[in-house]
């Protein structure tokens, strides 16, 4: 997990959950833009992804492993005592929505980009 702080007066903190088989490095531009616009950013590589150590990339034993990571990042974000938002992309969006089904999160809002969802008619 990494933290990037804005050099401006902070408006809030954004916790980012990336897509499947991605890593933090792919979000350099997003992180830069958020910081430039007054937001701290907290993000890490999800278990089995990026620079995490797994024999088989993308493999986890339990989906709750993702929840534990996101909850820890949100806890750290809330230490700033300013509004916390979560941003989920693809798998990250699915993780956040699944987590919201199970528990109330201490956040001000969510942003979802192409969350992995199936909509039933």
Predicted regions and their residues:
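A short loop-to-beta-strand scaffold at the N-terminal edge of the catalytic core in hydrolase folds
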Residues: 1-5
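Catalytic nucleophile-loop/oxyanion-hole region of alpha/beta-hydrolase
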Residues: 21-24, 50-80
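Conserved alpha/beta-hydrolase
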Residues: 26, 31-55
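Short beta-strand element of the alpha/beta-hydrolase
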Residues: 11-19
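Alpha/beta-hydrolase fold nucleophile elbow
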Residues: 78-90
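Structural signature of beta-strand start/N-cap positions in the alpha/beta core
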Residues: 13, 40, 83-85, 109
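Alpha/beta-hydrolase-fold enzymes
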Residues: 89-121
């Amino acid at each position: 997990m990494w933290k990037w702080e804005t050099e401006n007066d902070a408006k809030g903190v954004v916790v980012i959950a990336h897509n499947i088989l991605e890593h933090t490095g792919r979000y350099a531009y997003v992180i830069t833009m958020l910081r430039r616009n007054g937001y701290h950013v907290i993000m890490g590589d999800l278990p089995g992804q990026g620079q995490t150590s797994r024999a088989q990339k993308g493999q986890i034993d339990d989906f709750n492993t993702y929840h534990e990571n996101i909850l820890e990042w949100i806890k750290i974000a809330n230490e700033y005592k300013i509004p916390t938002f979560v941003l989920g992309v693809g798998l990250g969006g699915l993780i956040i929505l699944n987590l919201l089904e199970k528990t109330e999160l201490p956040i001000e809002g969510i942003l979802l980009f192409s969350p992995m969802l199936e909509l039933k008619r």
